[in-house]
Amino acid sequence: VNAPAFDQILRRLTEAEVKFVVVGGLALGAWGVVRGTKDVDIVVAPDAENLKRLAAVAEAIHGHVHAGESFLSSQLSIAGQLANGEQVAIETDLGRLDVVQGLDGVPSYDELKERSTETEILGIKVAVCSIDDLKAMKRAAGRTRDLADLEDLDATGQ
């Protein structure tokens, strides 16, 4: 497996006009907290057309989703998984893409988008969640790593 190419994932999503907001580790980086991340976390607009575009991008980079014992790799199957409104982790040739939805403490796409900032991540212009939304999601997740991230975010003084 090659090193993740998160810039390529972001570029493909942007070029396909997928409506998304970056959250998670890459958003931390955008707000000045440097830490490794093993996936691209995004919240997407939940309309069928947008999910179809996202699934097409996933299929093009050999994405597959684990569903119980099986794994699904067609655009239709991936779109179906996304339409369930639950979190979907898509393993691709370029790295892991985590579509965060249906989790406690994660605002809707519209809310996140409204408060987001346009910024460059890895040379790609994307919408990144606000620092307040990022802190709220980290608090809600509450894992040890998230609490450490919160301290680091506070230390940036933003």
How would you label these PLM feature ranges?
Residues 1-158:
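Compositionally biased terminal segments of proteins
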